[in-house]
Amino acid sequence: MSQGLFITLEGPEGAGKTTQLARLEARLRAAGHAVTVTREPGGTPLGTRVREVVLDPAVEIEPLGEFLLYSASRAQLVREVLRPALERGETVLCDRYADSSLAYQGAGRGLSLPLLRQITAEVTGGLTPGLTVLLDLDPALGLQRAARRGQPDRLEQADLTFHRRVRQGFLDLAHAEPQRFLVLDATRPEDELEAEIWAAVSERGH
């Protein structure tokens, strides 16, 4: 059985990742593909607990500790969900993955990118997406969108300067790996974004 395709959706707060992930899942299933959908942090019992902690506005976490919590969740997700699904030949869709740590804890919090990459390589065993869709959005607009969802979480409460660094971090990652990244303007109509994402997935044999 051939290895499945690993697709991640990335972007700043309020970019519409969850919406496009659901649309892509529906298209893949309609085309007859077996699909596993998950998210970071989350996707496992440990990941769910980590998510509760890192997004809780009442919890203060220093930057390296924050990264290590995400890494613990990621290690569990790779072992329990991602690798088994890919080995079954399934298409895996993940709402955020390692690039989010490089953007948020690296560019955003100022941690050493070489250190983060080294730890991430160990945590993931080198598991890299075949396609990463980056929904790019001005942070001010993204935070406005996110605020409409309700009480902001710990990351959404960070200042605009932090979120601008995160956005630039994502764009720098995409510039460094243009073969893996598809960068889309998240202010475009949802139907247009869905069509471009589907075209990129189809180019990769799906």
From Swiss-Prot:
Write down the EC number: 2.7.4.9
One GO molecular-function entry:
dTMP kinase activity
For biological process, the GO terms are: dTDP biosynthetic process; dTTP biosynthetic process; dUDP biosynthetic process
Query: Is ATP-binding included in the keywords of this UniProt record?
Result: yes
Classification via InterPro entries: P-loop_NTPase (IPR027417), Thymidylate_kin-like_dom (IPR039430), Thymidylate_kin_CS (IPR018095), Thymidylate_kinase (IPR018094)
Residue positions binding ATP: 11-18
Q: Which SUPFAM superfamilies match?
A: P-loop containing nucleoside triphosphate hydrolases
- Which Gene3D superfamilies does UniProt cross-reference here? P-loop containing nucleotide triphosphate hydrolases
- What's in the keyword line of the UniProt record? ATP-binding, Kinase, Nucleotide biosynthesis, Nucleotide-binding, Transferase
**Superkingdom in the source lineage:** Bacteria
For this protein, what reaction is catalysed?
dTMP + ATP = dTDP + ADP
> What is one Pfam family matched by this protein?
Thymidylate_kin
PANTHER family assigned to the protein according to its UniProt record, in alphabetical order: THYMIDYLATE KINASE (PTHR10344), UMP-CMP KINASE 2, MITOCHONDRIAL (PTHR10344:SF4)
Q: Which family does it belong to?
A: Belongs to the thymidylate kinase family.
Its function, per the record, reads: Phosphorylation of dTMP to form dTDP in both de novo and salvage pathways of dTTP synthesis.
The record ties this protein, via HAMAP family, to: Thymidylate_kinase (MF_00165)
**Can you name this protein?**
Thymidylate kinase
Name the gene for this chain: tmk
